Structure formats: C-alpha cells, structure tokens
C-alpha cells in the first residue's frame, strides 16, 4: 500500500517534468532564427513549407514567388553575418530570375534591403532587386547577378563586402566593392567578366 501511494506522486512529478520539457522544446522550435548558424554559414531552405511565416508573408506582399523545383537549385538562404542582424536572400521567379534580401529586425519584422547598383559607370541607384543573390561566408561577400532573358545578353555582377563595423547600418554592414560586366553564353556562364568599377 505504501508503494502504491508513493508511486502516484512520482508518476505525477515525472509527467509534469515531461510536459515541461515538451513545452520548452516547442517554444525553442517556434523561433526559426535559432536555426541560423552563428558563424555566417547559411541555413538553406529548399521547400516552400519550411519558409518562416514572417518571411513568407513579406515575400507574398512583394509578389516574390518560388516553386519547389526552383528552390532545389536556388534555395532561400538565411544567415547571420558576425555582428549583424540575421538576414535572408531569396530568389524570385518572373520574366527573369531575380532576388531580394531582407533583414530580420529585433521585433521580428522584416525590412527589405535596397542595394547600390551601377547601371552605368559613375551612376549609382538603389534597388531592392539587384539580381540573384549569393552569399560567400568565407569571403564575407554577397554577389548580385543581374539575369537576362536574351541568349548572349550582357549581364552585370555587383559584389558587396561585409564589414562588421557597419553591422547596424541601412545595408546591414554591406558595401559595394566591385561591378563587373560580361556576356553569358547560350550554354551557360562564360569567363569573360570585365571590371567596370572597383573600390
């Protein structure tokens, strides 16, 4: 009888502990930014179902569409440059493929980034659609490749370098360092890039 009366409090305590553990795990899993590695390496998202809700809402508002097939080749990347807010680079389908970048603000909202682009030497504009974006965590560079729907058409590649001293600025620490132009061949990329501007 003593064993039975003692078993009930222990069972109740064990079930309470398991419930608390499940609650803590669920709370931890609810914040998708916790999945972003702290060392600049990207978290690649290859399925629309895995896109964090706040980002999915921002993409819908911007009419930035992805498909399952496109995301296998061009995944969404979430990364955290050292000393900066987490950010996302996203491919979008349209007449040509283009990209958008967002910074996750402290309150959980997203802010679209407008990058400096140089359509002509010496002329700088800001654009939220600088091109298809790629992050290199080792070099701490973000490249934007302007796509083209014409075979053998001229394309532009902008390179932005991350500087943690400017992690909280308008571009989340990125500055334009190089602009190149080249022609993409009908069968893929050519190695004919010419530097148009470099800082």
Please report, for each region that a protein language model flagged, where it lies by residue.
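Sec/Tat signal peptide C-region and signal peptidase I cleavage site
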Residues: 25-29
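Bacterial N-terminal signal peptides that target proteins for export
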Residues: 2-15
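Short, surface-exposed coil-to-beta transition loops
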Residues: 96-100, 127-129, 152-157
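Bacterial N-terminal signal peptides
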Residues: 14-23
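An exposed acidic His-Trp-rich patch
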Residues: 111-147
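General secretory precursor processing signal
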Residues: 6-8, 67, 95, 154, ...
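Flexible low-complexity loop/turn motifs enriched in small/helix-breaking residues
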Residues: 30-101, 105-125, 194-199
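Acidic, small-residue rich beta-repeat scaffolds with periodic aromatic anchors
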Residues: 31-51, 58, 62-63, 133-199
């Amino acid at each position: 009888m003593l064993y039975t009366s003692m078993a009930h409090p222990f069972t109740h305590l064990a079930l309470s502990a398991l419930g608390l553990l499940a609650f803590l795990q669920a709370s931890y899993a609810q914040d998708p930014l916790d999945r972003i590695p702290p060392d600049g390496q990207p978290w690649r998202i290859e399925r629309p179902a895995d896109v964090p809700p706040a980002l999915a809402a921002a993409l819908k508002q911007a009419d930035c569409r992805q498909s399952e097939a496109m995301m296998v080749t061009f995944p969404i990347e979430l990364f955290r440059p050292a000393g900066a807010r987490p950010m996302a680079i996203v491919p979008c389908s349209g007449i040509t493929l283009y990209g958008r970048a967002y910074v996750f603000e402290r309150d959980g909202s997203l802010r679209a980034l407008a990058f400096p682009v140089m359509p002509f030497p010496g002329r700088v504009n800001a654009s939220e659609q600088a091109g298809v974006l790629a992050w290199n965590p080792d070099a701490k560079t973000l490249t934007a490749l302007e796509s083209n729907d014409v075979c053998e058409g001229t394309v532009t590649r902008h390179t932005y370098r991350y500087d943690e001293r400017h992690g909280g600025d308008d571009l989340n620490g990125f500055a334009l360092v190089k602009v190149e132009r080249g022609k993409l061949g009908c069968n893929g990329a050519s190695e004919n890039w010419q530097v148009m501007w470099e800082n």
